[in-house]
Design a protein with these regions (language model features):
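Short, surface-exposed beta-strand/beta-hairpin micro-motifs centered on an aromatic residue
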Residues: 114-116, 153-159
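Short, acidic Ser/Thr/Gly-rich low-complexity loop/linker segments typical of extracellular
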Residues: 58-69, 76, 108, 146-153
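Short amphipathic beta-strand segments in non-cytosolic proteins
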Residues: 43-62, 98-103, 134, 141-147, ...
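A short, amphipathic beta-strand motif
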Residues: 26-32, 43, 85, 154-156
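Short, ordered, surface-exposed loop/turn motifs in non-cytosolic proteins
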Residues: 34-59, 90, 133-137, 162-164, ...
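Structured interaction patches on ligand/partner-binding surfaces of diverse proteins
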Residues: 105-106, 110, 141-150, 173-194
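A short, solvent-exposed beta-strand micro-motif common in secreted/extracellular proteins
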Residues: 43, 82-87, 164-174
Length: 219
């Protein structure tokens, strides 16, 4: 009898815990000032009520080299994630970063695997290649498990338990005034939608800088 009572108590406790925290979808719509949807903008939600956990040891992400470009151009990982750097090209790459969040160098050869790199410090990691100096990529190390990148419709969908959250966005071409913006959200059991319109246009890309009249790499 005691065993049955104990087992029943455990089941009831688990049931109560399951219903004490709802999961809701937060849809973040990100546009420029003209209302045009923006793709690959990182949306992040920080839980104001709880500490934001570090990723488990098994978390692995991939930053590939394809056609002498970083793929994806921008990778978002949770703090504590390991990142693999495969080389899908038939040429050598020499990937590096001097960013405070992660400093490293990797000589990458086709079909030769190297140990994944641990990204344990939140922040922006800018990637380059010593062999192909036009290559540029980013790894954003998030100190929250709640993040997503916007799709072609400018929508980022994040599933979170109920609570109070702070919403922010990031992209390498965002102005400082837009990356500094914060929105406070109180999330319950119902899905919500949030619109986020940029204050300023995206900064020019490297391709756009190179297209400036009269500029060449030899100037």
């Amino acid at each position: 009898m005691t065993y049955l009572c104990t087992k029943l108590s455990v089941i009831l406790l688990a049931t109560n815990l399951a219903f004490s925290s709802y999961a809701a979808q937060v849809s973040v719509f990100i546009t420029d000032k003209q209302g045009k949807p923006l793709t690959n903008i990182v949306a992040l939600l920080h839980n104001d009520d709880k500490s934001n956990a570090v990723a488990g040891e098994q978390a692995i992400a991939i930053m590939d080299q394809i056609n002498r470009e970083f793929v994806p151009h921008t990778l978002v990982v949770q703090q504590g994630t390991k990142v693999k750097f495969p080389n899908s090209d038939n040429v050598q790459h020499h990937v590096y970063s001097f960013s405070p969040a992660k400093t490293f160098e990797l000589k990458l050869y086709s079909e030769l695997e190297v140990e994944p790199q641990l990204f344990n410090t939140p922040g922006v990691v800018e990637l380059g290649c010593n062999v192909h100096d036009w290559m540029l990529g980013y790894i954003y190390v998030a100190d929250t498990p709640y993040f997503a990148q916007s799709n072609n419709e400018g929508k980022a969908i994040i599933t979170v338990p109920d609570g109070n959250y702070t919403l922010s966005i990031w992209h390498p071409r965002l102005s400082d005034s837009d990356t500094a913006r914060r929105s406070n959200l109180s999330i319950g059991k119902d899905d919500i939608a949030v619109s986020f319109s940029l204050f300023l246009p995206l900064l020019p890309s490297l391709v756009e800088y190179d297209a400036v009249e009269g500029f060449t790499e030899y100037d």
